[in-house]
Amino acid sequence: LVGAASWHDVLSHILSTQGFNTIMLSLKTSIAVVVLTLIVGFPVAYILALKQFRGKAVLDTLIDLPIVMPPLVTGLCLLLLLNPSNPFGRLLQQWGIELLFSPYGIVLAQFFVASPFFIKTARESIAAIPSNLLSASATLKASDFYTFRNVILPLCRKGASTGLAMTWARALGEFGATAMVAGNIPGKTETMTIAIYMEAMSGGLNRSISTALVLVLFSFTLLFILKIQAGRQYEY
């Protein structure tokens, strides 16, 4: 990729209106997915790791399913669910909620595909916490929220940070489900991955390479920073 296009072409494409809008849309949606994953994912990971309830195995399997299921299939399921011909999609339409072929649809598709990486990693990190620490907190009559905030969260920070980095990178690189749910509307739903595909198929190989380089650079930089902050050791 580095030697496939001149830096002049790369910079020209990045600074163009289309290239800039594509990059900004991808960053905004992937960051929104990270925030949504934190809000939803931590409680789910906590429940799966420490609570016992009927249907736990089913919920656990459903959460892990998008990891192994083709993104196109995930996107197709969401497309059918949100379609106005479906009762749920019709209800959303009556409420004025537009998800299909919109940036919100991008966030939804990326969330379903990427959030399991965080939930799975956070769940395993929480489950690895020594039970005597949790028992001590319970003996002191600490609430579940206090235990989560002051015992669980600090101890699973490294694993959660890694999972969050994986989620962000997966959301940023998502293509199949996004294309099914949001389509390709330039300036509205054209993410970097969709732009890479469309440019390559239409003969704009240099523009496709330029966008791919930006995607690789963003992914490498953020993953590197997050893992260093998590205290991981790396070979340089």
What residue spans do the PLM features occupy?
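Glycine-rich helix-loop "coupling/hinge" segments at transmembrane-helix boundaries
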Residues: 80, 177-203
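Short glycine/proline-centered loop/turn elements that form peptide/ligand docking sites
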Residues: 129-133
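Short coil/turn motifs that cap or connect alpha-helices
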Residues: 54, 142-144
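Hydrophobic transmembrane alpha-helix segments characteristic of membrane transport
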Residues: 9-10
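Membrane-water interface segments at the C-terminal ends of transmembrane alpha-helices
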Residues: 1-6, 15-127, 151-176, 199, ...
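Glycine/proline-centered hinge or cleavage motifs at structural transition points of membrane proteins
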Residues: 140-141, 154
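Short, Lys/Arg-enriched, Gly/Pro-containing loop segments at transmembrane-helix junctions
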Residues: 232-236
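The alpha-helix within a helix-turn-helix
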Residues: 137
